[in-house]
Amino acid sequence: MSHTILLVQPTKRPEGRTYADYESVNECMEGVCKMYEEHLKRMNPNSPSITYDISQLFDFVDDLADLSCLVYRADTQTYQPYNKDWIKEKIYVLLRRQAQQAGK
């Protein structure tokens, strides 16, 4: 498990910047999914449930002014930065694994 910091800037306005930290990369990717789900709930307040596909989630990620991760590397005792493309790849792997486990 690698400590992971998620840096989020929803719009071009710098004062909207925020961050969250997680105990692992997977927890962080789940956090990005939850952030999108909260966005969908705000956009559809009267809907009893929400559904989406991965392309919609990726569009949301792409529409953020900035989204990046800092992942702790024990070997160098530093944080390695990663961009949106890396985040989308990790989300894809996470969701594919969850779908495979649900199908068992």
UniProtKB/Swiss-Prot annotation:
SUPFAM superfamilies reported in the protein's UniProt record: ERH-like
Family matches, as InterPro entries: EHR_sf, ERH
The keyword Cell cycle is annotated on this UniProt entry: yes
Keywords: Cell cycle, Nucleus
Classification via Pfam families: ER (PF01133)
Compartments where located: Nucleus
Entry's Gene Ontology cellular component terms: nucleus
KW Acyltransferase (keyword) present: no
Subunit (UniProt): Homodimer.
Family affiliation: Belongs to the E(R) family.
Known function: May have a role in the cell cycle.
UniProt protein name: Enhancer of rudimentary homolog
Organism: Danio rerio (Zebrafish)
Gene field: erh
